[in-house]
Regions:
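Amphipathic alpha-helical polymerization modules
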Residues: 1-133, 139-141, 146-271
Length: 271
């Protein structure tokens, strides 16, 4: 039985090493959130077992929990780069798939059609507003699109995004038009989000449905234009965890080796 106990320790340590390696590999990934491996002990016995005689039979990985603490904010100077200074996620919709995902990576750019999108072509979602900045009757989200030419025929000259998410388009004739406000999503339990890769997640039953609102409203943080949120990976902390996981793996391997030697001793006694 000691073989299987130590083998479970090897597998758990190997999983931990993989999670830490993934964190380290993404230390420079914009909007990345690290994960932590959580363990649970395994015990042999049932409800009728004598608690004084129950023994442990190993360990299992109970969860690989995502850590949504904020990463450092880095200034870029690009007005369409956005960082959330608090909770919340950007909502982005696939141009072809139509599927909505959620991200902390605010590296957006303007395409030839006037859409704000990320590097994969997913379009930033906004809520259309009236002249006073109030949401429309439906309050539904839509792709963020800036008219390249205004009603007077003037070309788009620039864009600004306020901390409350207000998107303003400036034109060559000096006119300024408020297009809408950036939509942010919050969740009852962000750790329940399913990672999709590329610093994106999708909602699940564990996370709860997305609650769409404006920056600075409810639990949502405000926006900082011209900045991006870096990965929340602390390399020093991960290196310490890596050493600990490596020693854990080596210790379990040694325990298997010791059990093997004991078994061989017993076999030798019988011969």
């Amino acid at each position: 039985m000691s073989f299987y106990t130590s083998l479970s320790g090897l597998r758990a340590a190997q999983t931990d090493l993989g999670v830490i390696a993934h964190n380290i590999a993404n230390a420079e990934t914009t909007g990345f959130k690290k994960s932590d491996t959580q363990f649970a002990d395994l015990v042999a016995g049932g409800a009728a077992s004598d608690p004084r005689m129950m023994k442990g039979i190993g360990v299992a990985v109970s969860a690989i929990a995502q850590n949504f603490t904020l990463g450092a904010v880095e200034q870029t100077g690009n007005v369409t780069d956005l960082a959330i200074t608090g909770d919340g996620f950007f909502a982005v919709r696939g141009g072809e798939s139509g599927q909505t995902a959620f991200t902390r990576n605010g590296a957006f750019m303007l395409d030839q059609g006037g859409f704000l999108h990320d590097g994969a072509g997913n379009r930033l979602q906004m809520i259309a507003t009236d002249g006073s900045g109030n949401p429309g009757a439906s309050g539904a989200t839509a792709d963020t699109r800036l008219p390249l030419v205004n009603a007077a025929g003037a070309d788009l000259a620039g864009v600004t995004i306020g901390k409350d998410g207000t998107i303003s388009a400036a034109y060559a004739d000096g006119a300024v038009t408020n297009v809408g406000r950036v939509a942010l999503a919050s969740f009852t339990s962000p750790v329940g989000l399913r990672p999709l890769g590329n610093s994106k997640w999708e909602a699940t039953g564990l996370s709860g449905a997305p609650q769409i609102g404006f920056p600075g409203a409810g639990r949502n943080g405000t926006l900082l234009s011209g900045a991006l949120e870096r990965s929340n990976v602390d390399l020093a902390e991960e290196m310490i965890g890596l050493i600990s996981a490596q020693r854990n793996f080596q210790a379990n391997a040694k325990a298997i080796d010791t059990a093997s030697q004991l078994s061989q001793t017993i076999i030798n006694l019988r011969t």
